[in-house]
Amino acid sequence: MSQLDYNNMLVAELKQELESIGLPTSGKKSELIERLMAHSKEPVMISIEADLIDEESRYDMIISRMKTQVIGPLNIGAVIAILLSVLMISTVLIIQPSWLGFGDDYDYQLIDFDQSQTKIYAEELVALGHPDWEGRMSGTVEEANTSLYILDQLSEMGYEAQSYSYEVPMHHVNSEPSFRLCVQGGLGFSPCDGPIGQVGGSQVTIFQHRVDYVIQGLSGQSEYMFDEDIPVTDLGNGTEEALWQSATGTLGYVRMDESRVSNTEMYSYAAQNDLAGIISVNKIINCGQIEGNDCVPIFKGTNYDALVSANGGTIPTEIPFIAMSRDAGDIFEALVINATEPASIELIIDVTNDEERTIYVPCGIIEGRSSEVIIAGAHHDTVYQGEGAVDDTSGVTTVLEMARQLAEIVNNTGMPERTIQFCTWGGEEEGLWGSRAYVAEMQSSLRNNLRLYLNFDMNHVDADFQNRGNSLTLFTNNEDDYGHIKRIANLYTEERDEIANKYDIRFSLLDGAKGESNEMPCNSDYCPFIYELDGKVGRAVSCYGSGAWEYHTYLDTMDRFNEESLHVSGTIYGTYMRLLAYDMNA
């Protein structure tokens, strides 16, 4: 074979090739290919004429002996043929060589998964949200109550409940914000508020919190009133540095387009140039898909460390940051950006962003015979302004139902070989704070004993298959885990076809080193379990669904919850967790 042929082979196939020719099978893929290429270049021994002396006479003698009868009608040749056949069959059935396609025989037993129970969990979790804004934001009483709920559920299942708490940087929305525009009547002398303003013809436009605008991650506070006439600078799509430099002391207005300037970049530019605030407008994401023709405002986080660095070592506390819908942005542009006499602005954002708040990590544990551990997790916090039914209530409910099923298996089967652990994380939406703090605290134990971390973040598929698709992707950073997942998925397709056949189940192996194109991206709670184990690369699997157009908006509600879709990843990954719990060779 050529090197190109070997490059197209899987590592498992390369190892089978090496094993079949008696060469070592250890090492990276590049080393395996190099070993095979070196072997293919070895000279082949060819017989020369001297080796053929008296060959014809020897063949005649051998053939004569092979025809000699030894048992009834059987001659020596027939006996040898029978013995060789028996030997080959024995090799196949007993030894099962890898070069014939045989591998380790794993006992995959699909776990049960009650999708109706996941909906019960989801409804109970959503009910714990903020009374007005509906979210379970990290560092709030809503998140604390969510953690207690999860601990209670795990305890009832028979797990040893353990609660961890961490003080981390976190912003907090203290009260309902206000964002209004005023075009003064009476030749500009009429007040904006009160009966005199109404008589004088002043027109006040009120933007609705959560629907027309949302506060962004780590936003600072503001109390800009109508009479301050705070100026606005049009920053286009936010990519021109000169415009940012010209916007000192003003509200910067950014139209989000294909350039997709991140929140961290915008907020950092604002801090470096002393802006009075930022207003970004969604002009591109999910437009006309979830609310008429509008582009709904989306909550996004900001990288804390990058922002602090841009601001000279502290968090900027006096730069409010909001995101608007396209329709609301059009109104703002008409009344402020493009108006001959710009409307006055009231922007009251009551937040605290320079303090630490307590976030929680509830866990349930069933001890195994060995020190090795398998952990499954999901983040229980949501954005502040929405239920988060998909992100990530769907993941938490999957984890709880898996935990319930695994507890029942342990009750019937006995102590597992590996420790089984289920955890949920606070602080994910603002920077993976909970999972990172937990990994840092458990650093030594996890580095030495973590077999696998299983992550569930938006492992949900919207029920509108026709318009939103029906795919979900199971992905991992380890080839062995990838093989297990595919084999279990094949079994799932055979035994649970009534659900499996509805979904496009995809697979992805992302085993590149950090920074490479095929790396596991660091955008969910599996990140610290892979990259923050003191130099060791951890192993993780995760699942991502599809069709979540309402992501990070006030419309991510139970109206779109499709509990059936959780059955796929919950059963496949739960089955793998079961295998790892009881088979130390897996």
Feature names for model-found ranges:
Residues T140-V141, G200-T314, E318, E387, ...:
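Extracellular/luminal Protease-associated
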Residues M1-E49:
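Basic helix-extension-helix modules of the SAP/HeH family
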Residues G547-A586:
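His/Asp/Glu-rich mid-to-C-terminal helical/loop segments that flank catalytic regions of hydrolases
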Residues M1-S2, A38, P43-D104:
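Secretory targeting signatures
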Residues L406-W433:
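Short helix-loop-beta-strand segments that form the rim/entrance of peptidase-like active sites
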Residues I120-L251, E258:
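Noncatalytic luminal/extracellular "stalk/propeptide" segments of secretory-pathway proteins
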Residues G329, S371, W425-C543, A548-E550:
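Metal-dependent peptidase/peptidase-like ectodomains
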Residues Q216-E240, L307-A389, R404, E408-G414:
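Soluble metallo-hydrolase cores and metallopeptidase-like ectodomains found primarily
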